[in-house]
């Protein structure tokens, strides 16, 4: 099974992806996580350091695939999760989609691409071109990470459009949304009501998740010295269980941008509940309008 994880930049995709990968490994799966971001920090939480990228390795070998061994590009992370970083072209040049293609090509050359039960692609930020949507060409499912804010839901809606487009040519499905760092879910609920899709899980604001990223450790590793974090791990195990159930998934239909703006701004102007909720919604809205 191949899973592509998308979402707005800075939403916590990589931290979420790493914890999901470990959760899947805990369920007995052989897992490979592929970071698809020029920052090449997707797997930092699994390995504790920035591993060499596929592109760096190819360049050092003058693109002679026959001179590259699996151990040159596949690094062992926490919990037995194997890690690969695709890397990216130089800033302002090249195409991220080409890099993803080269990564998959090399893994196939090494007979590694089909050796895993789960391959998880952790993909950079918003989908702005076909190149960044390239991992969807290989995925069975897409998971979108969001929060309860305007920006993240607009990005989710754009990703939804990419899923629909890619699903025309192969059996790609949206498994659902994962809410991250979310104290409320009113905007999420409003969005999925208008654009029906599953909500796999909604994680509350948990400071230890942010701290885990800084430490370069997954929550599963941290729980060894902090047993009180077990409850956080259960969120990720629940997500893993839903993925392993091979959900039917959907081919979503995105909402036109202006309609989405109207939909979410209506909730801002006509909040349900007291002044505290209205203030929180206003903060989300103003954060969007400043962009």
From Swiss-Prot:
Residues annotated for [4Fe-4S] cluster binding in this entry: 95, 129
Main enzyme class: oxidoreductase
Keyword Iron-sulfur belongs to the record: yes
Keywords of this entry: 4Fe-4S, ATP-binding, Chlorophyll biosynthesis, Chloroplast, Iron, Iron-sulfur, Magnesium, Metal-binding, Nucleotide-binding, Oxidoreductase, Photosynthesis, Plastid
Pathway(s) per entry: Porphyrin-containing compound metabolism; chlorophyll biosynthesis (light-independent)
Main location: plastid
Pfam families per the UniProt record, alphabetical: Fer4_NifH (PF00142)
GO molecular function: 4 iron, 4 sulfur cluster binding; ATP binding; metal ion binding; oxidoreductase activity, acting on iron-sulfur proteins as donors; oxidoreductase activity, acting on the CH-CH group of donors, iron-sulfur protein as acceptor
Residues the entry annotates as binding Mg(2+): 14
Chain sites annotated for binding ATP: 10-15, 39, 180-181
Cofactor: [4Fe-4S] cluster
Annotated catalysed reactions: chlorophyllide a + oxidized 2[4Fe-4S]-[ferredoxin] + 2 ADP + 2 phosphate = protochlorophyllide a + reduced 2[4Fe-4S]-[ferredoxin] + 2 ATP + 2 H2O
Record EC number: 1.3.7.7
Keyword Nucleotide-binding: yes
Record-level GO cellular component terms: chloroplast
Compartments reported by the entry: Plastid, Chloroplast
GO BP: any one term: light-independent chlorophyll biosynthetic process
Top-rank taxon: Eukaryota
NCBIfam families: DPOR_bchL
HAMAP family: ChlL_BchL (MF_00355)
Function: Component of the dark-operative protochlorophyllide reductase (DPOR) that uses Mg-ATP and reduced ferredoxin to reduce ring D of protochlorophyllide (Pchlide) to form chlorophyllide a (Chlide). This reaction is light-independent. The L component serves as a unique electron donor to the NB-component of the complex, and binds Mg-ATP.
Family classification: Belongs to the NifH/BchL/ChlL family.
Assembly and binders: Homodimer. Protochlorophyllide reductase is composed of three subunits; ChlL, ChlN and ChlB.
Name of the protein in question: Light-independent protochlorophyllide reductase iron-sulfur ATP-binding protein
